[in-house]
UniProtKB/Swiss-Prot annotation:
Pathway linked to the protein: Nitrogen metabolism; nitric oxide reduction
Gene: norR
Protein name: Anaerobic nitric oxide reductase transcription regulator NorR
Higher taxonomy: Bacteria, Pseudomonadati, Pseudomonadota, Gammaproteobacteria, Enterobacterales
Keyword Endoplasmic reticulum: no
Binding site for ATP: 215-222, 278-287
Protein's GO biological process: phosphorelay signal transduction system
InterPro entries associated with the record: AAA+_ATPase, GAF, GAF-like_dom_sf, Homeodomain-like_sf, NorR, P-loop_NTPase, Sigma_54_int, Sigma_54_int_dom_ATP-bd_1
Sites of 4-aspartylphosphate modification: D57
């Protein structure tokens, strides 16, 4: 089999049709999977010795949340080192990173695997992976044909990274040095709420504004603060953390502003406070709503005038600090109740950000679960940790009052329990491994079965034919979208459609 010009042109056209990078990446992967008739395909971005999934087709949804460190995945490390097409033999002893992650075939091992490293010049920027369940599935394609595919994918990814970099630099004030955009490695999630939050982070990071980050406990406010700092011109300087809720009143002022020798009992030497440590960098004040009114007044002065006084010292020190504050309280209500200063609130909330709770993030829960599964796999030295369909269904319908932190702990506990119930280094998480309160799952939909005067095979084919027709009509005859709607493999759908007479 060889690629025609029409096939390559179709791939290029699909890339141009996409609206935004994510849509283009998904169109690329879906089209490639259809053309190559493989069981699974993925586009990965390379960053800091790990591969980060950008788009997948034919793989479990939680793969998008996983981070594949090279030291834990020898096949991916081989792809990163190769510099050219890598074909893994069916009997390769190197474990496939997607074993157990192809829906409907969790118990089967991937047989055929091809890796295509993607380069921008001499720099590795990503990889394409193609997987199939048949050992000789990709033998019909020459290395030269696969290199053409890799070149198209590398061009799309390289352009996306360049645009991302240029957009970031355009938001810089004046002649500030270029900086990196918000790293997708940290901010996991594709829900509308998280997409909007990432955009807002990218916007405010380029400025020097104070930011108030609000959100329920466990939503990841500290992660947002890190993302802002790392995407800002101050990223070369320290990000200093202080949990205001853990500060005893007797030492709070010293922690913030420092003290001089002899300022109080136990002050045996001069000591810098958090503001001095964060000079020219960023200070993250977590749980800002827990500060006393007296300390709030002193904090306000620093924000207004940019100088501090160590405890026991009459001299003022100039500091250049950007303040990021976080709270799980409604500070407007705290102001009305007299527990928080209105002037400080307005100083801090120049650019407010709200982190959505996990229950409002849709399928992000599955992506995050995949991320934590991969963390557990590496930490415990397991060959794989995968979620069963029942576990995924449970996670999607649980309310998670403790948000992402609760999910993380639940995954870690479930892995330990599942590992104890089976031998070997492979763990499959089932619903019973999660100790959630009773969760009401929606009843399965049962379709009405019409009375037909056909044998079983004819009735089955008639049902399949009509189902595919309806799905195609609803998806404007887009086969990839139709396959996603029917939750089946697009290559298998094409083969079935041909057998049913729906395609030539």
């Amino acid at each position: 089999m060889s690629f025609s010009v029409d096939v390559l042109a179709n791939i290029a056209i699909e890339l141009q049709r996409g609206i935004g990078h994510q849509d283009r990446f998904q169109r690329l992967i879906t089209t490639l999977r259809q053309v190559l008739e493989c069981d699974a395909s993925a586009l990965l971005r390379y960053d800091s010795r790990q591969f980060i999934p950008l788009a997948i087709d034919g793989l479990a949804k939680d793969v998008l949340g996983r981070r594949f460190a090279l030291e834990g995945h020898p096949r991916l490390e081989a792809i990163a080192r190769a510099g050219d097409v890598v074909r893994f033999p069916a009997d390769s002893e190197l474990p496939d990173p997607y074993d157990g992650l192809i829906p409907g075939q969790e118990s089967l091992k991937v047989h055929a695997c091809v890796g295509l490293p993607l380069f921008a010049g001499q720099n590795l920027i990503g990889a394409l992976t193609l997987d199939g369940m048949q050992p000789d599935q990709f033998d019909v394609f020459s290395d030269e044909e696969l290199r053409l595919i890799a070149a198209l994918a590398a061009g799309a990814l390289s352009n996306a990274l360049l645009i991302e970099q240029l957009e970031s630099q355009n938001m810089l004030p004046g002649d500030a040095a270029p900086f990196e955009a918000v790293k997708q490695t940290q901010m996991i999630g594709l829900s509308p709420g998280m997409t909007q939050l990432k955009k807002e982070i990218e916007i405010v990071a380029a400025s020097d504004l104070n930011v108030l980050i609000s959100g329920e406990t466990g939503t990841g406010k500290e992660l947002v603060a890190k993302a802002i700092h790392e995407a800002s011109p101050r990223a070369v300087n320290p990000l200093v953390y202080l949990n205001c809720a853990a500060l005893p009143e007797s030492v709070a002022e010293s922690e913030l502003f420092g003290h001089v020798k002899g300022a109080f009992t136990g002050a045996i030497s001069n000591r810098s406070g958090k503001f001095e440590m964060a000079d020219n960098g960023t200070l993250f004040l977590d749980e800002i709503g827990e500060l006393s009114l007296a300390l709030q007044a002193k904090l306000l002065r620093v924000l207004q005038y940019g100088d501090i006084q160590r405890v026991g010292d009459d001299r003022s020190l100039r500091v250049d600090v950007r303040v990021l504050a976080a709270t799980n309280r409604d500070l407007r209500e705290e102001v009305l109740a007299g527990r928080f200063r209105a002037d400080l609130f307005h100083r801090l909330s120049v650019f407010p950000l709200s982190v959505p709770p996990l229950r409002e993030r849709g399928d992000d829960v599955i992506l995050l679960a995949g991320y934590f599964c991969e963390q557990c796999r590496l930490r415990l030295g397991l060959s794989r940790v995968v979620l069963s369909a029942g576990a995924r269904n449970l996670l999607q319908h649980y309310n998670f009052p403790g948000n992402v932190r609760e999910l993380e702990h639940a995954i870690h506990r479930a892995v330990v329990l599942a590992r104890a119930t089976r031998s070997g280094d492979e763990v499959i998480l089932e619903a019973q491994h999660f100790a959630f309160p009773e969760v009401t799952l929606p009843p399965p939909e049962v379709a009405a079965v019409p009375v037909v005067k056909q044998n079983l095979r004819e009735a089955t084919e008639a049902f399949q034919r009509e189902t595919i027709r309806q799905a195609l009509a609803q998806n404007h005859h887009n086969w990839a979208a139709c396959a996603r709607m029917l939750e089946t493999d697009v290559a298998n759908l094409h083969r079935l459609a041909k057998r049913l007479g729906l395609k030539d």
